[in-house]
Curated annotation (Swiss-Prot):
NCBIfam families: PRK00596.1, rpsJ_bact. The gene is rpsJ. Pfam families: Ribosomal_S10. It comes from Deinococcus deserti (strain DSM 17065 / CIP 109153 / LMG 22923 / VCD115). HAMAP family: Ribosomal_uS10. This is Small ribosomal subunit protein uS10. InterPro entries: Ribosomal_uS10, Ribosomal_uS10_CS, Ribosomal_uS10_dom, Ribosomal_uS10_dom_sf. Keywords: Ribonucleoprotein, Ribosomal protein. One of its GO terms (biological process) is translation. One of its GO terms (molecular function) is structural constituent of ribosome. Belongs to the universal ribosomal protein uS10 family. Part of the 30S ribosomal subunit. PROSITE patterns: RIBOSOMAL_S10. GO terms for cellular component: ribonucleoprotein complex; ribosome. The lineage of its organism: Bacteria, Thermotogati, Deinococcota, Deinococci, Deinococcales.
């Protein structure tokens, strides 16, 4: 039987807020007695856009914009009820998207 594991994926445009929230999660989980793996930085997704500056002509005048989406991964091994309760009440900064999944283990 595989031990239960919680996988947390964090996404955001601001890498500082992302690292801050990842460290908050790791500190909270360690205080409850569960084992933590991470935060692991995943590849950054870069979306680039090329836009004409002029509304009509001057095709050579263009502007380039990009959006960088940073990702982090945190795995929690052998979580307890106290761990899950503390994660539910955790206050994280805005602009960070959190995806929580349970992996492995059967009841």
């Amino acid at each position: 039987m595989v031990a239960p594991k919680i996988r947390i994926k964090l996404r955001g445009f601001d890498h500082k807020a992302l690292d801050q929230s990842a460290s908050k999660i790791v500190d909270t989980v360690r205080r409850t007695g569960a084992d933590v793996s991470g935060p692991v930085p995943l590849p950054t997704r870069i979306r680039r856009f090329c836009v004409l500056r002029s509304p009509f002509k001057y095709k050579d005048a263009r502007e380039h914009f990009e959006i960088r989406t940073h990702n982090r991964l945190v795995d929690i091994m052998n979580p307890t009820k106290k761990t899950i309760d503390s994660l539910m009440t955790l206050d994280l900064p805005t602009g960070v998207d959190i995806e929580i999944k349970t992996v492995g283990g059967r009841a």
